[in-house]
């Protein structure tokens, strides 16, 4: 057995002990180092600025969108904006657009319920403030006089929202602030939901716990924030609640856009041309008076080669208007969409500008392209069951410069086109007698719709007077229609040629490529004047002379779309020709023929749903013809004209035409029911509801609702058709059979008498409150109540007043009470009808007819004996 030396054993023991002590020492030193490092880390954190801590702490889930305009950071469900210091005080636009919604009746995708608002960010103490910029006043910025300073005090900005500052960058070049509350919660300036649904008023209760941010994007000159919200919606009207606490989820996209550093030279408006406007107050340097003027909305089109333009040669523009077409459009739509955009180049070429309007597909190889980027104007496909399209735009409120424009095309617009083509042209065109339009017809129809919407994005409003420039005979002429189409402007609501009859061979049924008025409007709005050096006052004088040269030609007449006050029969929607009566009669003849052949032409429709839709459109079209004739009473033609032209600004139709229209409605109201073919009622579900009976009831009421309107026209022209003459005609026609001692009345004759007595009673009981003409409110009638107001509006015409006219040319207001004596007129006829009934009842043998007369008499007694 081997023996171990005691000293060796001792050494081994000592080594082990020493070794363990070293390890413990190392651990101790390590712990001290960690503690020291943590202490140093805490000290470093304490020395970091709040800005630095934001970007270094809890950043795992942070999403950022960075750009030269501004940056957005989404962190822990909070949204922060980082704005360059140099951008404070810069003017921007902000707006909110509905992106999607659970119920499209409560908000339209792609729609802004309020226009873009000019804003700027400023720093006040320890917060950032968003101000609504008041740029209504235009003045010479070099004028430092006390007068200007005092005037500017009436045009101050509005503080809209304040944001807490999170931090400042170390170099002082940017400010970080919390914008969560502003974007996540409902803002009264940016309502996403509509305010009304039919007769119901909408109110909503937001659910903040269900709101969240969805997207943040930042680009060179703009940025977007996407938000999803949920609200409980309640619909209320005078009869109660239609909905209560109805849950609705919707997405909103907020967009911010930097305005151009150098404003565009504006162009003053002219009420004789159809441009959208932005209103300004100008402080005139010559007399220090403030004058309200309007600038038109238009794109900044600067020629590349000004010398070529001066020589009368075509030149391109520095920045063309490019529309990008959504990839989501069905392939068979795309050709028509692109052709509709490019139509407008023909108008720009007339003023020397080439390839102004361009169209491209959404780019595949451009990583910066984004349809939400306001740098790009897009034609968007909206897959929602809405039969519509629209062309909204963003513009600089300082000058009217259009910066971005989009065309929103809803998927069911195809349904509208199919129905229009069938109902308006099937009497002559076999190609439209099908459930689905052919590719060629679809392309042609879409091209027209898109061209109209692109016209809006170019700044053009509707011109509802255009179609009244052509006669019925012209619309039935092959040579005329192939050259001029159905209207001088595609910005009118004049569709296809419903006047043309089956015997009119070779007639064109289509609207024009572009009308004469469209070329004229583009020339007025976009013509470049190289020698006037961007002097908008000098340009305005030249342009006024240009318009005056065309003033007497109906082809170049602009008729504003009538909203509240509807007095002018020559400026209405969905009409053709200068003769509504003749056009309506021809249109009704065509609709009758189409209705008779509906089953024969549409055979692949086992459930009759499509025929039901077409039949509904037929009735709507027919009602439109009646309404166009109804507008001839009072028949006040409104024109925006210069005094030097000698053309009256308002002119009442001849008395004979007014009376003809009034009597036509009474005599032909019964004809509407002829569209209610019993063979259709038997197998088309919609027709089985007998809607034509309901429409006819409305038409019967329409025949006697002209007293108040005639009071207006009679006020302007004492030689025109008077309210008393009208009531006498209505009375003589409606009670004519009774006056002649008829022993039997038709259903229509009974309904007319019943409607007339109801009208008389309503007038006696409620006066002007409930008895105003259809489409006219008693407190919103038309034209100036002061004889000198019109003179003042144009008194400075020869002295170079800023622009021509006032705004868009909407008629001034006239309080109905000043001229409307409906109650006075109807009292005498209520007494007259009562006397007739008292004489007639004793000698009426038919029990049913006698009961009818007694009912009318009882109603009149109740009103007259109060």
Question: Where would I find each of the regions flagged by the language model?
Answer:
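Positively charged n-region of N-terminal signal peptides that target proteins for export
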Residues: 1-6
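Bacterial N-terminal signal peptides
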Residues: 9-19
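Conserved catalytic/binding loops enriched for acidic/polar residues
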Residues: 467-866
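Extended catalytic-interface subdomain
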Residues: 395, 401-409, 447-458, 500-510, ...
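Boundary at the C-terminal end of the N-terminal hydrophobic targeting segment
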Residues: 20-25
């Amino acid at each position: 057995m081997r023996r171990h030396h005691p000293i060796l054993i001792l050494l081994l023991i000592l080594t082990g002990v020493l070794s363990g002590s070293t390890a413990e020492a190392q651990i101790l030193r390590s712990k001290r180092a960690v503690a020291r490092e943590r202490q140093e880390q805490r000290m470093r954190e304490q020395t970091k600025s709040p800005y630095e801590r934001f970007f270094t702490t809890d950043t795992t889930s942070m999403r950022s969108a960075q750009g030269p305009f501004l940056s957005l950071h989404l962190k822990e469900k909070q949204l922060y904006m980082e704005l360059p210091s140099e951008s404070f005080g810069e003017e921007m636009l902000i707006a909110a657009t509905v992106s999607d919604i659970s119920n499209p009746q409560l908000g339209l995708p792609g729609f802004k319920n309020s226009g873009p608002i000019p804003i700027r960010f400023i720093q006040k103490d320890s917060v950032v403030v968003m101000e609504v910029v008041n740029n209504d006043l235009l003045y010479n910025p070099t004028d430092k006089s006390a007068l200007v300073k005092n005037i500017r005090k009436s045009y101050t900005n509005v503080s809209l929202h304040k944001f807490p500052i999170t931090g400042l960058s170390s170099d002082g070049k940017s400010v970080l602030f919390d914008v969560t509350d502003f974007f996540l919660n409902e803002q009264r300036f940016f309502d996403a939901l509509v305010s009304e649904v039919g007769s119901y008023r909408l109110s909503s209760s937001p659910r903040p716990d269900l709101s969240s941010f969805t997207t943040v994007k930042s680009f060179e000159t703009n940025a977007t924030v996407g938000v999803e919200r949920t609200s409980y919606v309640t619909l209320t009207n005078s009869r109660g609640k239609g909905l209560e606490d109805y849950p609705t989820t919707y997405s909103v996209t907020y967009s911010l856009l930097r305005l151009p550093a150098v404003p565009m030279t504006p162009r003053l408006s002219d009420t004789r041309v159809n441009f959208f406007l932005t209103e300004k107050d100008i402080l005139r340097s010559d007399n220090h008076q403030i004058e309200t003027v309007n600038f038109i909305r238009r794109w900044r089109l600067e020629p590349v080669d000004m010398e070529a333009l001066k020589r009368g040669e075509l030149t391109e523009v520095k920045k063309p208007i490019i529309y990008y077409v959504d990839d989501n459009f069905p392939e068979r739509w795309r050709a028509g969409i692109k052709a509709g955009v490019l139509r407008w180049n023909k108008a720009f070429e007339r003023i020397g500008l080439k390839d102004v309007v361009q169209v491209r597909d959404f780019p595949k190889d451009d990583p910066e392209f984004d349809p939400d980027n306001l740098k790009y104007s897009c034609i968007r496909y909206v897959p929602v069951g809405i039969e519509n399209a629209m062309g909204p735009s963003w513009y600089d409120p300082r000058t009217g410069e259009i910066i971005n424009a989009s065309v929103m095309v809803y998927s069911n617009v195809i349904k509208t086109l199919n129905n229009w083509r069938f109902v308006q042209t099937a009497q002559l065109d076999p190609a439209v007698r099908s459930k689905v339009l052919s590719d060629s017809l679809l392309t042609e129809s879409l091209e027209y719709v898109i061209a109209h919407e692109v016209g809006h994005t170019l700044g053009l409003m509707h011109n509802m007077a255009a179609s009244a420039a052509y006669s019925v005979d012209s619309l039935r002429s092959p040579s005329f229609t192939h050259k001029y189409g159905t209207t001088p402007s595609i910005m009118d609501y004049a569709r296809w040629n419903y006047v043309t009859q089956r015997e009119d061979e070779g007639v064109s049924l289509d609207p024009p490529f572009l009308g004469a008025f469209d070329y004229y409007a583009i020339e007025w709005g976009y013509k470049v004047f190289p020698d006037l050096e961007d002097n908008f006052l000098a340009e305005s004088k030249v342009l006024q002379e240009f318009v005056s040269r065309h003033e007497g030609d109906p082809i170049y007449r602009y008729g504003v779309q009538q909203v509240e006050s509807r007095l002018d029969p020559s400026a209405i929607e969905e009409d053709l020709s200068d003769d509504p009566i003749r056009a309506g009669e021809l249109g009704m003849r065509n609709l009758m023929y189409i209705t008779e052949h509906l089953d024969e032409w549409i055979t692949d429709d086992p459930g009759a749903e499509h025929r039901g839709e077409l039949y509904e459109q037929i009735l709507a079209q027919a009602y439109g013809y009646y309404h166009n004739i109804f507008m001839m009473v009072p028949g006040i033609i409104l024109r925006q004209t210069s005094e030097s032209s000698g053309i009256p600004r308002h002119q009442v139709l001849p008395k004979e035409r007014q009376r003809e229209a009034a009597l036509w409605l009474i005599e032909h109201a019964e004809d509407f029911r002829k569209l209610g073919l019993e063979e259709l009622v038997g197998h088309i579900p919609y027709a089985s509801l007998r809607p034509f009976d309901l429409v006819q009831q409305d038409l019967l009421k329409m025949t006697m609702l002209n007293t108040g309107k005639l009071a207006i026209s009679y006020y302007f022209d004492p030689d025109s058709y008077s309210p008393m003459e009208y009531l006498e005609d209505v009375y003589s026609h409606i009670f004519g059979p009774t006056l002649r001692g008829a022993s039997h009345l038709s259903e229509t004759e009974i309904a007319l008498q019943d409607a007339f007595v109801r009208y008389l009673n309503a007038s006696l009981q409620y006066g002007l409150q409930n008895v105003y003409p259809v489409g006219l409110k008693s407190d919103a009638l038309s034209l100036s109540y002061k004889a000198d107001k019109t003179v003042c509006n144009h008194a400075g015409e020869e002295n170079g007043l800023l622009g021509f006219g006032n705004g868009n040319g909407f008629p001034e207001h006239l309080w109905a009470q000043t001229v409307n004596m409906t109650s006075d007129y109807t009292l005498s006829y209520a007494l007259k009808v009562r006397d007739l009934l008292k004489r007639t009842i004793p000698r009426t043998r038919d029990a049913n007819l006698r009961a009818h007369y007694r009912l009318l008499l009882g109603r009149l007694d109740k009103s007259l004996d109060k």
